């Protein structure tokens, strides 16, 4: 945006506003960066929700100032004075403004760090509002510029929605892990989940979910050049869940399907382009998460006698399954590193869901993350140097990974000796279950594919 304007303060606002009309609850997100040094330290940019376009209209905004001040500003009534709640974050460049009825929640961060939030309640702007991006130079004789990136407007799940019965739409996104830049390459009001990147880099494989028995549980190959999705022939296996994985060489596809065994998840393999599934796991439920780099074994989570643990089995089904973990509570998301020397997984054995690792036969189990998040589904980069994960806050049961939450995609270096390393946020996402359940790195290690969620606006 390019703008002048005296200020957004007191009883009279002057600014450039790129808006659209919205109703009900919604979330806005963006990365904001001022262009140039600027003239006035109080130049302002951010996200705004406004009752109308009059200069003295009631509003709420999430604002970043030129001097680094970050705050939630609001005017309660027409012609009233602007009030402010300061954020503890200085110089934020990631901002989010969420409306829940008459509550407005402002979350801010410096890219790489988690959000810090402040909120205000009982601000009555009416159901239909003007919402969007703004800039004011704080000087009517000066023109300033701001760049907004990763702009999202999200319609969250409705209050009281029932998981696995009620669904909202999906967006397939590609994340540049070096810059944090995100690109939406596919949208659908019907939900889909869990992209796998093909080793040749040309396509992604995902599954449909949702409540429609004629549409859910199918696997599709999404061509990145044409942006078209093609149904994969999986024979009788038409109730696939989100635990599907390509072999390292890309020739075979492992699936977790619920068409047999009274709806229990069973692992099958078939050619990557489609074919007749071959059953691999004799026991259920079994949820696939990884092939070994040499293609000889499959890693999966198995529910046996009320316990969910990590197992491996020959990928041709020629031998029995081998249990690799025995700790009480959920162990899930096992994945081989590209060199085959380690298996990373998530476990609740410490009280929170954390990332662990072990040897290829279950030996030397050690904790990798030591933080206050609930971390799920570790994915090693193709060069074995980085570990991606999805991180929930404290608003969930640590043994669960629910749909439709505020989550982070985080990245941490893999250390050879397992010593502690810090994870940084690379994406601020509304998603959760189905976002990155399975390996989704690009073959060159520069990007991660994931699914975010929004209902129709």
Which ranges hold each PLM region?
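Extracellular glycan-recognition regions
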Residues: 1-161
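Sequence signature of WD/YWTD-type beta-propeller architectures
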Residues: 158-457
